[in-house]
């Protein structure tokens, strides 16, 4: 989960190769957290990195409001904006975001202690069915909002790459790598960039 950008693990390397072949417009990283935490979904915590576009923020908020509608209807606890940010570039939400997608993490209580059912510290019972239902609901809610905004999602995705190519925000437009470097290091870099 923390190795998307650095790809030090074989699994991460394989994941990124597949991700880059597909380049999804929306990417959700479904997770579980400690058993006593309510469900978490976007929008992410402030501050946002300066390269995250207004559109990425806007769609995260739209999706989060849609999730809230379903959670409120069912009296399910949730939170947003408090903990999980979009600063570290190597998470399953930030890597897609920094690559033009709407990247989000959804955190459900349960984790390895959850089992089929577990009593939380406030005396409630958290079941596997609850956990599945919450993730299922946010998954379909994400698809619902995406279907209502499909043209804008595609347009903004294209715009992200067009602006990156024609009007990059960073200080540098080009990097020069000396040919005098060790050939294995150059091959590793080329492989990583591919």
Show which residues each predicted segment covers.
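Structured catalytic-domain cores with a bias toward divalent-metal coordination
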Residues: 1-194
